[in-house]
Structures are given as structure tokens and as C-alpha cells.
Amino acid sequence: METRQVSRSPRVRLLLLLLLLLVVPWGVRTASGVALPPVGVLSLRPPGRAWADPATPRPRRSLALADDAAFRERARLLAALERRHWLNSYMHKLLVLDAP
């Protein structure tokens, strides 16, 4: 059986690539630009403290660390929204230009 390659215009290829980038979850990006898996996927720590002694005091996170984490999470969310807005406007522009 012979398979046939479907030829696509460069615009259609670009549109498909942009859709793929929008749909696939890429995880967290580091400063180097390398995407890491979401937190906890490759964790070396045990998933729970079921076998830990309940009398053992757990260290509390400082308020500054929690505030810093919330700030980073908000910055990531805003960056993702900005990327999505740019991608939607770019795809709309491509669709308008391709319209007959």
C-alpha cells in the first residue's frame, strides 16, 4: 500500500505549529529556556509523610518565601496570558489574510 504525502502551504504549516505550541503543556521554563516538567513529576522525596512521626515538628515556610513563590506564579500566569493573546491575534491575522 502506498502512502501519499499531503502538500501544505507554509502558512498552513505555521498555523499547525502554532496550534501545537498552544495545546501541548510544556511545563515550567527556566532562565536558560529549557522546559522542565511540572513540579512533583520527578520528585526524589516520598509523596507523603505517612510514615513520619506525627510528633516531629515540620519546618514552616517563611512568609517571604511564600510571597516570592506567589509573585513568580503570578508572573508566569501573566506571561502565559500574554503569549496566548499574541498567538490568538497572530492566528486571526493569518485567517483574515487567507480569506478569499
Swiss-Prot record:
GO CC annotation, single: extracellular region
Predominant location category: secreted
Tissue note: Highly expressed in fetal and adult brain, cerebellum and trachea. Weakly expressed in spinal cord, fetal liver, kidney and heart.
One Pfam match: TIP39
GO biological process terms, semicolon-separated: neuropeptide signaling pathway
Subcellular location: Secreted
Alphabetical keyword list: Cleavage on pair of basic residues, Neuropeptide, Secreted, Signal
Signal peptide coordinates: 1-30
Superkingdom assignment: Eukaryota
Proregion residues excised on maturation: 31-59
Presence of the UniProt keyword Secreted in the record: yes
Role this protein plays: Plays a role as a potent and selective agonist of PTH2R resulting in adenyl cyclase activation and intracellular calcium levels elevation. Induces protein kinase C beta activation, recruitment of beta-arrestin and PTH2R internalization. May inhibit cell proliferation via its action on PTH2R activation. Neuropeptide which may also have a role in spermatogenesis. May activate nociceptors and nociceptive circuits.
PANTHER family: TUBEROINFUNDIBULAR PEPTIDE OF 39 RESIDUES
Assembly notes: Ligand of high affinity for the PTH2 receptor (PTH2R).
Similarity comment: Belongs to the parathyroid hormone family.
Record protein name field: Tuberoinfundibular peptide of 39 residues
Species of origin: Homo sapiens (Human)
